[in-house]
Curated annotation (Swiss-Prot):
This is N-(5'-phosphoribosyl)anthranilate isomerase. The lineage of its organism: Bacteria, Pseudomonadati, Pseudomonadota, Alphaproteobacteria, Hyphomicrobiales. One of its GO terms (biological process) is L-tryptophan biosynthetic process. Pathway: Amino-acid biosynthesis; L-tryptophan biosynthesis; L-tryptophan from chorismate: step 3/5. CDD domains: PRAI. Keywords: Amino-acid biosynthesis, Aromatic amino acid biosynthesis, Isomerase, Tryptophan biosynthesis. It comes from the Bacteria.
Length: 220
């Protein structure tokens, strides 16, 4: 079974068209100004129209206030809100009530002890995104090109639905799928030639590997 594939940090029509054509289930736009993948909501809204109906549009925010969320929801019309900051369970409930949209909560993972951070959000978040904890000194909560020990996820309750993120690329995606029960994969830096610059050849290479894996015994 082919996992969901979310390509995050899209900024151009060419890369958006390519990931949708190759079969991305989700396309992510980042609304965090410190990120090299940041995009203005009005531009993201125009790009999102090209993906509408073919892939789910995900708005990625980091501790955004209501005014900014209002702008994003109005201009982008996302299918999903991804909260990648320190938003509390109460904040998630408030956001879900305000916008009536599914919420994916990002949880930063370095070791097994970090899995405990998932528990307070169970029953509130519609899905989780398990990302590698940012290296010391990084201003970015995600997109740092680092991964974590995926074997620690074996202890995670099977009821927890999650996308796996952090340092994924064509060279390790098969291992990630074999080692975890992730229902989806989230990539950003793994399909880039430079921070914030998506590479069409890397996008193609990644989808080639995923498609080959999905056809094999493990994906049958």
């Amino acid at each position: 079974m082919k996992p969901d594939i979310k390509i995050c940090g899209l900024k151009t029509p060419e890369t958006l068209e390519r990931v949708v054509r190759r079969g991305a289930s989700h396309v992510g736009f980042i609304f965090f100004e410190k990120s090299p993948r940041y995009i203005e909501p009005d531009l993201a809204g125009r790009l999102a129209e090209a993906a509408r109906g073919a892939a789910k549009v995900v708005a990625v925010t980091v501790d955004a206030d209501n005014d900014y969320l209002d702008e994003i929801v109005d201009l982008v019309r996302p299918d999903i809100l991804q909260l990648h900051g320190s938003e509390s369970p109460e904040r998630l409930l408030h956001i879900k009530a305000l916008y009536g949209l599914p919420v994916m909560k990002a949880i930063s993972i370095r070791d097994a002890a970090d899995l405990a951070k998932i528990e307070p959000y169970i029953g509130i978040a519609d899905r989780f995104l398990l990302d590698a904890k940012a290296p010391a000194g990084s201003d970015l909560p995600g997109g740092n090109g680092v991964s974590f020990d995926w074997t620690i996820l074996r202890s995670l309750d099977e009821s927890v639905d999650y996308m796996l993120s952090g340092g994924l690329n064509k060279d390790n995606v098969a291992e990630a799928l074999a080692e975890t029960r992730a229902s989806g994969l989230d990539l950003s830096s793994g399909v880039e030639s430079a921070p914030g610059v998506k590479d069409l050849s890397k996008i193609d290479a990644f989808f080639d590997v995923v498609n080959d894996w999905s056809k094999g015994p493990k994906g049958a």
